[in-house]
């Protein structure tokens, strides 16, 4: 039951998978997707649904829907039907269909009655409107869609069509899917429209809110057709923007620019039948068929109306050099063949080719030349071409099939109808293929066995070598083809072409003479269509003349051709050619012969040396300036800022004679490129190319250097390439925390927004002026006329009028003051961008490029000059103070107005009459104040008197009434005895209230009584009753008063307690109020506390590193001063006890700690002299002074005499440490080169020295050396020796052979001293390397010389590409001299260094590990010598976590795993170069050791003398030497700057040249500076341009500084202001983006070997080596001589296996491996889709095979571990060519492999 359930479940899953992967479901899915590609056809469909109503409207809806569906059906049919697909898939189809139909439809909509025939029939098919609706929906459905591009869907459809078998089912199902989606979409649109119609509230509220808009809405409804036509027009214009017009496109000239190489050029006007972008399989790809105009025999050019078929022949001559050194180019000789009868190209081509061929001449089938790509198409480019071929014995589609082969096959099929291929069944093909491969495999096995047998029996070399196959054309006689013509041979045997033969000029006499022996290729006769009646094919014998022609037409020289018998020649040419002999008078044969002389496929390619418009503006490519730019750059203009015509320095005159052939008339121009402030839609497109090729690109920034497709946004690592400044961010965060002011922020935001709006408006105005034709000319003339009118007409006229009016008013005129101000006004001509030139000089091309006129010190007419600051000036100064700037200038507008900025809003001029009116108002005010002063005083006093009288009166009345009321109250109450005793108490609030209420009652009673008495009309009974009532009330009052009196006595006693309760109540109430307030404000209080705490903590964290580094350095400095440097002064106080040298004790601690971690520090960084100098400074007794040193030196006697200097030997002999004359013995080198021995142990890497030199060339070694990681380039850690070649110093604890530092050895003081002295002596090993014979890099000398070092190179690179922000290119001086240095030795070292300078580069370094040093600085003592502090403190504190992690990120293949957390130091020696007679100073930043380039012996000696003299000067007076050297540098620098005038491509210094080379060749970059700096720099540039042209620039300079126009902090005071300084200050930020750089082949090979090598840290090598033979057999030992001296380890490992396949040749070895990979066993051929087969093996047999595989698993692993390097080296280089027909692995795309699954082997 369970089995049945699982079976059912498996069937369900398989059924679901089949349904999902079925053709119908996929077609429905793709069809449903195409519904969402909404295009212009939907506009017509919606218009028919929305607009048309009534009976005609329904018919229009039906016709629109029918046309819509029919158009989509045609699109789907075009997928299956190739001709329709070709017709509709071309871009020009849209042009041809859209333009006339668009015009027709547009005019028809605008003129409604244009096609109204007024037919009364009911047959609506005759109505033209319904037909047009049908056509609209049909035609526009065929166009490309624009909202969701249909090209993406078309690609998906094409991919599935490529893989699908049942294509028609897929097309129908996709159409059904589209139909379903379309019906659903239209139903949804209909429901939305119905809902809008039914919902009246939407129509009333949304559309018509008031009566104002009812008219507009009605008009909108009436003009709906017009709106739809406008939308249609916009969409069609959008299409035409992407589509090139077939008529108005730019025709490209076919000028060939290949750098002077000779080419086979052929002119043809016919289009290539199979245009392709890929290169033909030729040796030289510079030989290209191109379309160009040709000069015939040095005459005039061919007319455009006349076209010729021209065949070019070269007259190759030997190149002869003239006296001038120029070479004569080879002359081309041409002759006419045929003149075309048609005059126009357009009528020659068929209409289909003209309209529908999208691969026509205006398509950019070419590459743009740059430094990396020199040719049109790269050599050896892989060719992706789909065609059927046999793979695994079956017909497969290969995407790397040679296109030339397929083209040739198609041509044969067309011309030879009998040529048909019988389709053999797959079973037969597979068996045939299997048999062939089995035969090949057996042959290889036989060859393999024969080779082993030959080695075993010691046969001769002839029997071992591989046999070659020859082409035999006669088996009986065993006659073979000559080696030159044998296709099975290759290499030298086929011959070499040294130079092409010299063709004679082919004339008519030459053709008539040799016409009888003309040969025509048989293959040409098959392929080319020609009239067979024109000549008769006959085969005759060859005569002598024909053989002579063969020699002339041969491509091989006579010396290289092998001698062939006449019989063999006849047989060969019978096999290849038919001889055609015709009448010599018939000229048709000659023409036909010349027409089809060769098979060639014309691929349209054009010139690739195109220059962009930007390069034309810059004028850098002087050679190509005459060319018309072929690449459209961003819209820009070249603005010449400054033209240097005169020399400005003395150095120019001094070094004038150094300039060779300098043109004095040539002027240096400094120009700027002004870009237009608009989006760049050109995007480096080639002129005439199709914009539709790049329509998927999206500009998502205002200005974008690289345009990406939205499909690849996920591939971009960073959308924005910017530098992340952490410290700047911290400062900004702190500033925002500490200085928050919302009001100021709001005001600043408003100001910024306003300024942005104004800036945008200005840019728009400038761009509009620049965009219109002739607008700049009109504007320029208007500005010049306004300037002349203002300066010479309007302002003088105003001055005259003003002064004449002053004279009429009897005032003094102000002629002098006004004329002075008028003369001060300057009208400076500026460029369109605002760069100032001068008053008289107009900018270059100012009529076309534009002009600005800047008015400096503008003249304002004043009524008088002696007045104070006027109001407008005060307001203006106030504004200027707020802004922090003063702008005493303005720009002139076209209308004569003034603006602060070009194209800005007009400024309000100060009024002439405003100060006059203000003065008049002031005087009127003064008169008014004087005349009405008395009246004001009287009025004020009268009002005061009346107020006082009123107040007195009111006060008197109030007091009188109050006294009267009090008297009445006293009279009413009982008199209280004033003199009797009484208790005074305080009443509480309740008592007071009761008393007040009693008083009120009492008063009421009294009033009632008086009223009763006065009323005499009342009866007496009532009076009596009232009297009784009053009595009772009075009695009650008395009783109540008595009771209250008792209560008051008791209350008086408890007064204190009641007060206390009252106060406690008040406190509680206040506490409650405070508590609620606290609860409400507690959140803000907590936030405030957290902010304060976070600020404090953050500031503390920031200051921790600074404090710790400061404390640490202070402590180390004090320790050093205390324990080391005061030893000389306090030497007398040192006891005679056992002394400890502090820096050696620290070494002891460090080594003991490092021994636990298996790390030992390298002490080689100390120089020998320094060690002995420090030891000699210790003042102790003679016995203990050198006891430890003596033991060490006696232990290593072989070292002392060989290594120590003579002075130290003499000193040691005097002290009695060791004998002077000791025998020289070879030192046991404890640091054996294990890596080299390991390489020798593996025989396949035991290469000779020549092979190693080929493996890594000098260029490659230089590249490797340049990639070194430098930690500290200063002299503190530079080494005083150089290692051997291929010698790597490693940590001692990793090897058992190095027994000096054993982990079990106790590190005592004696061993420390021994180690110290041994390392110091052993550090330099040998002064001279015996293998090379030159002195090593004497870094000791560099410690005492003045060194010019490049700062910043030692900083760690955090990226895998070069970051120029790290490098600092300025030079720092270091004078390093000590009194204990011997000058004699110094001079000797200098001499040797200069002599061997040019040979130092021969010392090769194998890799990064060669320069590993422990980063141990001897507690900074070397730094004390140089007085130089460390730059980066983080290196000193956390080297384990910082340095090597970043190094491992950049080069993970270099650093071993065990060394990842260790320190090493690597130094690059940058030696200075003092030029003697050589021109120019070159401060290098990348060379490891500089040489004297191209110097002869005299110059070398002079250079050495210069260096020695400079050293002497430094010894005597270091400051003067430094100053002299500075002058030296300045002179050389000036000399190099003058060289720039000769050629613009020369740079100021080598640093700039290298930087420019880096930026142009290896990086695409963007330069930008900070926004706050931008305007300041531009303002400075503008002022500089004006000051340069003025004779007396002082006044303008001072005024510009006062105005704030020129900022002094940006002035370039330094001469050498390099890029590094700009980058450090944040002005310029260069951010290179990584590019794909083509790796060096030698480097790839070396890295491939390096992967297979086991690192020697993991590969332990024993102390002693044992030599073993490679194989035990004696016979093989003799034959394999190169494996005899192989050293192996004592322990047997898996790397010693013998590889049998290496006996085979490399070619057979590769073939053998590939044949092994194929499964060539017998197999039953069955259908691929059949899942069940009856012949199923049992389970036991399968398990047995698995067991067999498991047995050989270990052996297989061992075998593969040794085979892997061989596979890597050979297969990677040859696999692509062998399998995929690709000749270069770099261009092979792995994506294309992943697109197609592997084919299963059945």
From Swiss-Prot:
GO terms for cellular component: chloroplast inner membrane. It is found in: Plastid, Chloroplast inner membrane. One of its GO terms (biological process) is protein transport. InterPro entries: TIC214 (IPR008896). The keyword Disulfide bond does not apply. The chain crosses the membrane at residues 19-39, 68-88, 91-111, 133-153, 176-196, 227-247. The keyword RNA-binding does not apply. Keywords: Chloroplast, Membrane, Plastid, Plastid inner membrane, Protein transport, Transmembrane, Transmembrane helix, Transport. It is a multi-pass membrane protein. Pfam families: Ycf1. It comes from the Eukaryota. There is a partial copy of the N-terminus (positions 1-343) of ycf1 in the inverted repeat (BAF50686). Belongs to the TIC214 family. Involved in protein precursor import into chloroplasts. May be part of an intermediate translocation complex acting as a protein-conducting channel at the inner envelope. Part of the Tic complex. This is Protein TIC 214. It comes from Nasturtium officinale. The gene is TIC214.
């Amino acid at each position: 039951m369970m089995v049945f359930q699982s079976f059912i479940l498996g069937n369900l899953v398989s059924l679901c998978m089949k349904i999902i992967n079925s053709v119908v479901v996929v077609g429905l899915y793709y069809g449903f997707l195409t519904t969402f590609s909404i295009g212009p056809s939907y506009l017509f469909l919606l218009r028919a649904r929305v607009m048309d109503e009534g009976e005609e409207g329904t018919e229009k809806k039906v016709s629109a829907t029918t046309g819509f569906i029919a158009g989509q059906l045609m699109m789907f049919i075009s997928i299956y039907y190739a001709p329709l697909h070709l017709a509709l898939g071309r871009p020009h189809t849209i042009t041809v269909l859209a333009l006339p139909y668009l015009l027709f439809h547009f005019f028809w909509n605008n003129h409604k009655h244009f096609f109204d025939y007024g037919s009364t029939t009911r047959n609506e098919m005759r109505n033209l409107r319904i037909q047009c609706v049908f056509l609209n929906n049909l035609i526009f459905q065929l166009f490309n869609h624009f909202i969701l591009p249909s090209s993406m869907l078309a690609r998906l459809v094409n991919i599935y069509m490529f893989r699908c078998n049942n294509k028609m089912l897929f097309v129908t199902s996709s159409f059904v899917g589209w139909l379903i989606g379309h019906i659903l979409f239209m139903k949804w649109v209909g429901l939305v429209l119905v809902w809008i119609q039914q919902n009246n509230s939407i129509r009333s509220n949304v559309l018509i809110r008031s009566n104002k808009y009812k008219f507009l809405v009605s008009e909108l409804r009436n003009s709906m057709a017009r709106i739809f036509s406008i939308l249609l027009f916009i969409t069609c214009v959008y299409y035409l923007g992407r589509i090139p017009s077939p008529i108005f496109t730019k025709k490209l000239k076919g000028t060939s620019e290949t750098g002077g190489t000779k080419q086979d050029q052929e002119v043809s006007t016919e289009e290539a039948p199979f245009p392709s972008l890929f290169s033909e399989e030729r040796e030289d790809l510079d030989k290209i068929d191109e379309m160009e105009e040709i000069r015939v025999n040095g005459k005039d050019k061919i007319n455009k109306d006349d076209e010729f078929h021209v065949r070019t022949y070269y007259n190759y001559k030997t190149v002869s050099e003239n006296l001038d050194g120029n070479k004569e180019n080879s002359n081309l000789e041409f002759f006419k063949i045929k003149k075309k009868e048609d005059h126009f190209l357009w009528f020659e081509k068929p209409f289909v080719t003209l309209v529908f061929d999208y691969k026509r001449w205006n398509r950019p089938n070419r590459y743009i030349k740059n430094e990396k790509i020199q040719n049109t198409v790269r050599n050896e480019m892989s060719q992706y071409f789909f065609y059927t071929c046999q793979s695994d014995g079956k017909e497969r589609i290969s995407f790397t099939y040679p296109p030339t082969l397929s083209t040739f096959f198609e041509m044969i099929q067309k011309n030879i109808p009998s040529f048909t291929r019988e389709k053999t069944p797959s079973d037969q093909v597979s068996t045939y293929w299997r048999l062939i491969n089995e035969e090949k495999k057996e042959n290889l096995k036989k060859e393999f066995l024969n080779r082993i047998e030959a080695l075993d029996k010691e046969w001769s070399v002839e029997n071992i070598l591989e046999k070659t196959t020859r082409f035999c054309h006669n088996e009986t006689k065993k006659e073979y083809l000559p080696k030159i013509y044998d296709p099975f041979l290759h290499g030298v045997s086929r011959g070499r072409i040294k130079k092409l033969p010299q063709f004679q000029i082919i004339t008519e006499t030459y053709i008539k003479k040799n016409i009888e022996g003309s040969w025509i290729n048989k293959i040409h006769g098959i392929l080319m269509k020609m009239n067979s009646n024109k000549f008769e094919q006959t085969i005759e014998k060859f005569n002598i003349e024909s053989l002579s022609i063969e020699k002339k037409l041969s491509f091989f020289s006579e010396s290289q051709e092998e001698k062939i018998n006449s019989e063999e020649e006849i047989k060969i040419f019978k096999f290849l050619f038919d001889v055609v002999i015709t009448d010599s008078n018939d000229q048709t044969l000659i023409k036909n012969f010349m027409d089809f002389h060769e098979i060639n496929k014309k691929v349209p390619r054009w010139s690739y040396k195109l220059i962009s418009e930007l390069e034309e503006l810059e004028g850098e490519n002087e050679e190509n300036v005459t060319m018309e730019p072929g690449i459209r750059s961003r819209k820009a203009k070249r603005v010449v800022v400054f033209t240097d015509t005169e020399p400005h320095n003395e150095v120019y005159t001094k070094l004038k004679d150094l300039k060779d052939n300098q043109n004095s008339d040539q002027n240096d121009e400094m120009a700027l490129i002004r870009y237009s402030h608009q989006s760049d839609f050109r995007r480096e497109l080639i002129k005439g190319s199709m914009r539709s090729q790049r329509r998927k690109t999206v500009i998502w920034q205002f200005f974008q250097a690289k345009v990406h497709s939205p499909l690849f946004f996920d591939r971009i690592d960073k959308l924005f390439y910017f530098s992340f400044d952490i410290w700047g961010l911290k400062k900004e965060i702190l500033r925002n925390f500490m200085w928050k002011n919302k009001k100021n922020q709001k005001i600043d935001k408003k100001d910024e927004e306003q300024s942005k709006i104004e800036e945008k408006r200005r840019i728009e105005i400038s761009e509009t002026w620049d965009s219109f034709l002739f607008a700049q000319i009109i504007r320029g003339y208007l500005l010049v006329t306004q300037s002349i009118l203002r300066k010479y007409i309007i302002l003088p006229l105003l001055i005259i009028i003003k002064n004449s009016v002053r004279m009429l008013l009897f005032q003094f005129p102000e002629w002098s003051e006004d004329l002075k101000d008028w003369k001060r006004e300057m009208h400076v001509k500026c460029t369109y961008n605002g760069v100032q030139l001068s008053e008289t000089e107009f900018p270059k091309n100012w009529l076309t490029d534009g002009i600005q006129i800047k008015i400096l010190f503008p003249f304002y007419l004043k009524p008088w000059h002696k007045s104070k600051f006027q109001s407008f000036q005060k307001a203006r100064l106030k504004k200027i103070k707020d802004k922090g700037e003063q702008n005493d200038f303005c720009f002139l507008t076209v209308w004569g107005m003034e603006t602060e900025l070009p194209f800005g809003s007009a400024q309000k001029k100060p009024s002439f009459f405003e100060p006059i009116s203000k003065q008049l108002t002031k005087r009127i005010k003064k008169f008014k104040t004087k005349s009405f002063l008395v009246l004001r005083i009287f009025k004020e006093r009268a009002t005061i008197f009346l107020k006082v009288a009123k107040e007195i009166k009111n006060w008197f009345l109030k007091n009188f009434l109050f006294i009267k009321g009090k008297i009445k109250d006293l009279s009413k109450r009982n008199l209280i005895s004033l003199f009797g005793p009484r208790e005074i108490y305080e009443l509480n609030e309740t008592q007071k209230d009761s008393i007040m209420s009693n008083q009120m009652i009492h008063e009421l009673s009294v009033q009632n009584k008086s009223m009763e008495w006065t009323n005499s009309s009342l009866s007496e009974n009532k009076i009596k009753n009232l009297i009784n009532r009053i009595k009772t009330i009075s009695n009650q009052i008395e009783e109540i008063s008595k009771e209250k009196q008792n209560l008051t006595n008791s209350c008086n006693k408890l007064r204190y307690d009641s007060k206390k309760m009252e106060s406690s109540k008040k406190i509680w109430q206040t506490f409650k109020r405070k508590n609620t307030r606290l609860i409400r404000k507690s959140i803000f209080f907590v936030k405030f506390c957290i902010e304060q705490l976070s600020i404090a903590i953050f500031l503390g964290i920031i200051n921790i590193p600074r404090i710790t580094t400061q404390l640490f350095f202070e402590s180390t400095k004090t320790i050093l001063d205390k324990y080391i440097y005061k030893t000389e002064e306090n030497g007398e106080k040192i006891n005679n006890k056992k002394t400890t040298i502090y820096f050696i004790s620290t070494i002891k601690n460090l080594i003991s700690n490092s021994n636990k971690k298996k790390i030992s520090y390298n002490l080689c960084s100390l120089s020998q002299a320094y060690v002995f100098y420090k030891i000699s400074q210790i003042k102790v007794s003679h016995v203990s002074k050198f006891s430890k040193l003596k033991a060490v030196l006696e232990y290593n006697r072989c070292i002392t005499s060989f290594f120590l200097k003579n002075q130290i030997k003499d000193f040691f002999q005097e002290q009695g440490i060791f004998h002077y004359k000791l025998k020289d013995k070879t030192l046991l080198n404890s640091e054996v080169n294990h890596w080299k021995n390991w390489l020798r142990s593996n025989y396949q890497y035991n290469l000779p020295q020549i092979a190693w030199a080929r493996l890594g060339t000098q260029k490659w070694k230089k590249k490797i050396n340049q990639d070194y990681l430098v930690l500290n380039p200063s002299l503190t850690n530079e080494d005083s020796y150089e290692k051997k070649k291929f010698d790597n110093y490693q940590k001692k604890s990793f090897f058992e052979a190095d027994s000096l530092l054993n982990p079990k050895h106790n590190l005592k003081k004696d061993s420390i001293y021994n180690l110290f002295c041994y390392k110091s002596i052993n550090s330099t090993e040998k002064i001279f390397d015996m293998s090379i014979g030159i002195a090593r890099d004497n870094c000791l000398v560099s410690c005492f010389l003045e060194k010019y070092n490049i700062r910043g190179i030692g900083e760690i690179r955090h990226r895998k590409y070069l970051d120029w922000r790290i490098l600092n290119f300025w030079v720092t001086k270091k004078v390093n001299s000590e009194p204990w240095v011997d000058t004699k030795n110094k001079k000797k070292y200098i001499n040797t260094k200069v002599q061997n300078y040019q040979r130092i580069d021969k010392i090769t370094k194998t890799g990064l590990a060669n320069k590993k040093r422990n980063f141990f600085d001897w507690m900074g003592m070397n730094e004390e010598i140089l007085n130089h502090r460390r730059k980066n403190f983080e290196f000193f504190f956390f080297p384990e976590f910082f340095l090597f992690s970043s190094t491992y990120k950049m080069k993970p293949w270099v650093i071993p795993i065990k060394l990842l957390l260790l320190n090493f130091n690597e130094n690059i020696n940058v030696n200075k170069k003092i030029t003697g007679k050589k021109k120019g100073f070159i401060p290098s930043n990348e060379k490891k050791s500089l040489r004297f380039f191209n110097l002869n012996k005299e110059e070398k000696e002079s250079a050495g003398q210069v260096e020695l003299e400079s050293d002497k000067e430094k010894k005597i007076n270091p400051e003067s030497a430094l100053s002299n050297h500075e002058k030296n540098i300045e002179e050389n620098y000036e000399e190099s700057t003058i060289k720039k005038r000769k050629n613009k491509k020369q740079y100021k210094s080598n640093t700039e040249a290298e930087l420019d080379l880096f930026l142009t060749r290896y990086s695409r970059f963007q330069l930008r500076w900070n926004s706050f700096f931008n305007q300041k720099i531009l303002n400075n540039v503008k002022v500089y341009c004006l000051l340069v042209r003025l004779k007396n620039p002082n006044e303008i300079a001072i005024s510009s500084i006062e105005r704030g126009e020129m900022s002094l902090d940006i002035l370039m005071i330094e001469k050498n202001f390099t890029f590094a300084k700009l980058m450090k200050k944040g002005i310029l930020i260069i951010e290179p983006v990584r590019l794909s750089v083509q790796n060096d082949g030698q480097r790839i090979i070396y890295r491939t070997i390096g992967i297979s090598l086991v690192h020697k840290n993991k590969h332990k090598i024993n102390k002693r080596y044992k030599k073993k033979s490679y194989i035990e057999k004696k016979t093989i030992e003799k034959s394999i001589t190169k494996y005899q001296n192989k050293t192996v380890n004592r322990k047997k490992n898996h790397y010693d296996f013998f590889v049998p396949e290496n006996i085979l040749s490399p070619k057979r070895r590769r073939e053998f491996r590939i044949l092994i990979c194929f499964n060539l066993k017998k197999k039953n051929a069955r259908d691929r889709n059949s899942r069940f087969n009856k012949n199923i093996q049992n389970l036991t047999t399968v398990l047995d095979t698995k067991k067999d595989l498991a047995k050989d698993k270990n052996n297989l692993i061992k075998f593969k571990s040794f085979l892997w390097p061989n596979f890597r080296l050979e297969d990677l280089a040859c696999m692509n060519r062998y399998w995929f027909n690709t000749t270069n692995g770099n261009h092979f795309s792995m994506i294309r492999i992943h697109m197609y699954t592997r084919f299963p082997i059945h």
